[in-house]
Amino acid sequence: MSRVASSRVLKDSNGDIGEHLRNHIHLTNCIHLKNHMHNNNKQSPVLTDRSLLMRDLVVLQRSRSLRDPSASPNLKEDHQDSREGRRRSGLRLSGSSPIVSFGTSKVTPSDEKFDRSSRKSYRVEEVNEVYSVPSVKSVSKDRINKKVNEAIVKTLSDQLNEVGGDSDDLVSCNVRPRGDGCRRRKFRGTRRAGRAVNVRDNAAGNESEMSIASNSVPRGEKYEGEEGGGGRDREQNMSCGIPFNWSRIHHRGKTFLDIAGRSLSCGISDSKGRKGEAGTPMFSDSSSSDREALPLLVDSADNEEWVHDYSGELGIFADNLLKNGKDSVIGKKSSRKNTRWHQSFTQKYAPRTFRDLLGQNLVVQALSNAIAKRRVGLLYVFHGPNGTGKTSCARVFARALNCHSTEQSKPCGVCSSCVSYDDGKNRYIREMGPVKSFDFENLLDKTNIRQQQKQQLVLIFDDCDTMSTDCWNTLSKIVDRAPRRVVFVLVCSSLDVLPHIIVSRCQKFFFPKLKDVDIIDSLQLIASKEEIDIDKDALKLVASRSDGSLRDAEMTLEQLSLLGTRISVPLVQEMVGLISDEKLVDLLDLALSADTVNTVKNLRIIMETGLEPLALMSQLATVITDILAGSYDFTKDQCKRKFFRRQPLSKEDMEKLKQALKTLSESEKQLRVSNDKLTWLTAALLQLAPDKQYLLPHSSSADASFNHTPLTDSDPSNHVVAGTRRDDSKQGFSCKNRPSVEDIWLAVIENVRVNGLREFLYKEGKIFSISIGSAPMVQLMFNSPIAKSTAENFEEHILKAFEAVLGSPVTLEMRTESKKDLGFSSLQGLSNGERFRESGRSEIVEVADSESPMTRVRRKHLEASQNQNQNQNQSIVRGKVSLAQVIKQAEGNSWSKHKAVEIANKLEQENLKLEPRSRSLICWKASRSTRRKLSRLKVRTRKLRLHSLLKLVSCGKCLSTRSPPR
């Protein structure tokens, strides 16, 4: 292609076509370089060796085949300019061009000849050469063809051998004008002290290869701008500036040349354009229509203020890329204004002044007074839980120390120091995160500030918990050598991790956990500013879950705000992984009601949500605590529950809750060390209310048939003993009118259809215990084995009577009254609801509201026998309430009540007559004197009346153990 172009140049007599073809030759060389660079980037995309790159660039500059022929000056005009003393300079090749290798270049002898002639005509001082192209008119076509056939091919290695000196000298190929008339010499590959201007690449290391080419700036342009404006204006000889394949490369998008920009200039531009450069217009890249009319390469280095502004089509993309690189790396203030980056609630509402610090009044007051009184220390340590404002307080403290405001409140936020800190440009406030080691010398240099400056250097060391021992040693040395105007602020969560040598020299400020009230107020303020629709109870839950950390509460609120709906308590519970209080109370109600099956089912449903067993146990304990404190509201689903159905809870229910809380706290220890946590949690819930269908009233009972039933505590809800009552909602008994055992027994007797059996059961039998539950069980006690065998013959009638009264099938068990049972039944003479423990026994019995007449008679005489030792001379009847009056006030059927009154009246008359004898007969522990008197008495024997008297009055214990002497 170069041969064809050369022949066409020779045919052109005027030189216009030749100038145009030289532009196309220049474009061909650029395309050639593009292909070579593309191939080399595939092999080694990372430019690792800078020195080799510089040497290649020097060779590229000196390669005559890569020069821009259109930039060559006209021979006649150049001679004329030389005589007029005009100064000229050429373009320089950028040192940051990413070209690694290029193809071979041919240097013809004719080029060398005309190069020597050009050196004679023009004197050049700089490292660069000003190349001249011979006139087209002075060369014939035959001579050109002959010289081309004799061309010598020089490879890159041959050209590199010709280049001597340091490759780092890629100073720039600048052309500096000299005012003196001495001979100007040409230096090849050598440095001249004080003449070269070093060009550095200012682009970031992580930029792309295209940005490397576009960010290089020729520094020597300022010399040309100072001296190039004193001549006459000349027209720029850029020809048409449109390549031959413009229509193809223009519409396919950005090419390599568009991306590389003007810094990849592969030749020497026209030196004629150097004259009158001040009048060269600056092209804009605002519209596509403007860019279509721009020339390919235009030198814009004449204005020193536009150092990075390259005119022409190839430099437009480079300008945009350079601007984008600056905004991304440096972060200009203008880019921050135009681009609105998202800030979290923690960053957006971070404290700016001491008044913004929440819940740290003592710390704020102490630091404010220290600044106002100028009593600032050297070392401060802020310690406390996370999210309490330690780092924020350190930043506010640092701003206040450097604030220029003369008012009392600092920081002001409007002075130069505060504004520079907000922009991230304050060099007197340094924050250092957790690092493995410190650069001792570098950090010490930062602390060395000028004494005449009023600013104080504040070094904030955040998260000191993770600092190593070497860091502490280095910090200790820095503190020893630091000047007075340096303040160190250490931020950590605990003082235990800090060395003692540091802690002993610090002013320590503790940041406690924030109160829920303060956190709720702050969250309400944020919610109102951000227009978040949230319930107050939900805010309370968020604050309670934050554990005194405002930062955690703000992050939780920000997450909830992303849902886009009204924030309620169930939504917060689901978000943070909690179970609703209603579900917890339902589970607790089932566990306390001994509903084993539903308890296990509900527990499995809750655990399927992914909740940890420890967390569930902790929530259950929290709910129990709220119920005991009276702060829980049972307004919802109260009718569906069993244990919590009655409100307010009784004392017995409160005791059960306390026992349940104790059980959960003890089970938590096992739960932490166990691998199967769900099993332990299930066992703990089932222990809250074990199965209590059966009752053992006597732990020392000799009957082995009751050993299979579990012992019970003081809960009488499912068990009724002789003389007790029971509240059973399943049977329809209300709390106010629950039947007693005597009422049940009388109702059973009335339902017996055999008349003789009725009287027999009333005289010989009684209910010993009854259990009403899923499988009701009744135990009947008879006075003798004969009576028991007689009742067994009528067992079917008795079962039907019990089923009619209780409304369900009953398991009936009969037994004979023993001596212990007789003593037990004699102890049931207390008032309603009371319990007592007999001496030498461990039975606890609950007494019914009303007693039968026979029971009252026995209780009356039992009390008299117990008081005999205290006052033996006191009469049994005198000074006490009449038995007839007591029986009249007793509850019961009218027929039995009337009969009991008659018996009581007769009994009182007999007691008045036989008072001394009854005293010794009732209790065998009477004194000897009383027994002697009784032996001398003449008693008329009446066996029948005495037998009836002993049957009704005597306790049975004294007569069975010891008979009185006669």
Curated annotation (Swiss-Prot):
GO CC annotations on file: DNA polymerase III complex
Coiled coil (UniProt feature): 650-678
Keywords, alphabetical: ATP-binding, Coiled coil, Metal-binding, Nucleotide-binding, Zinc
Xref: InterPro entries: AAA+_ATPase (IPR003593), DNA_pol3_clamp-load_cplx_C (IPR008921), DNA_pol_III_gamma-3 (IPR022754), DNA_pol_III_sug/sutau_N (IPR012763), DNA_Rep/Repair_Clamp_Loader (IPR050238), DnaA_N-like_STI (IPR054506), HLD_clamp_pol_III_gamma_tau (IPR045085), P-loop_NTPase (IPR027417)
A GO biological-process term: DNA replication
Binding site for Zn(2+): C403, C412, C415, C418
Gene3D superfamilies associated with the record: 1.10.8.60, P-loop containing nucleotide triphosphate hydrolases
Protein family membership: Belongs to the DnaX/STICHEL family.
Protein name, entry field: Protein STICHEL-like 4
Provenance organism: Arabidopsis thaliana (Mouse-ear cress)
